[in-house]
Amino acid sequence: MVSLLDIIGPVMVGPSSSHTAGACRLGLLARGLVGGTPDSARIELHGSFARTGEGHGTDKAIVAGLMGFRPDDDRIRTALEIAEREGLRYTFGKTTLDEEAHPNTVRISLERGDRAAVMIGSSLGAGRVLVTEIDGFPVEVSGNYHTVVLVAEDVPGSVARIATLLAEDRLNIATLRLTRKKKGGDAFMVIELDEYPDEHVRDHIRGLPWVRWAFRLDKVSA
């Protein structure tokens, strides 16, 4: 079924929902992977993003998202200047990803303190986005839910333990995906939730001995 949002698009600053609203939401999601506004960002644009991104404000929108601005925030127009004042170092480039990549795709490499992350995501239109890769792991993150992402050792019972912790806090899991590159290696878990867990639950998850790191990605859809 086609929704009204699909027809008219989201409330936003800028001329194009794909190049501004979606781009801003990709920046918001990437931001969560390092726990806040990054110290530095390398932003590589693919396809249509690379060809028309600057003219459509894609560059401003992504940087705005990295600073926590929403798609309807008027500060998007001056996001690059704000980033420079705030000390966010950013560079832009063009890249060619594989043939299956959506035309409006970006690879964002971030550093914040001792944390680094690389995310690939696409703007699908009408402000909708899809993250397809995080730190080399294939994922599917829509931004339509509150999301927990974590890297953990591939040990038996890890998924059940985390699901139990969330259930004890009366949280409903919308989707849970686990990806691993090899048996016994690191496993990447993406959990989309209807509500975000309280701080004590997040601390408990981070404190599990086989969890290497865990971060939150806030819901970015309208």
What residue ranges belong to the model's regions?
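A conserved regulatory-domain signal marking ACT and ACT-like small-molecule sensing domains
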Residues: 90-92, 119-222
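Conserved phosphate/anionic-ligand binding catalytic regions in large, soluble enzymes, centered on
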Residues: 9-27
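Histidine-anchored nucleotide/phosphate-binding helix
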Residues: 27-33
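Catalytic-loop motifs flanking and including active-site residues across diverse enzymes
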Residues: 22-26, 58, 158
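A structural-propensity feature for long, helix-poor, extended segments
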Residues: 42, 46-85
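Non-transmembrane, aqueous-exposed alpha-helical and coiled segments at domain scale
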Residues: 33-42
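Short, hydrophobic/aliphatic alpha-helical segments
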Residues: 1-11, 41-43
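Contiguous domain-boundary segments centered on the initiation and propagation of an alpha-helix
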Residues: 67-113, 123
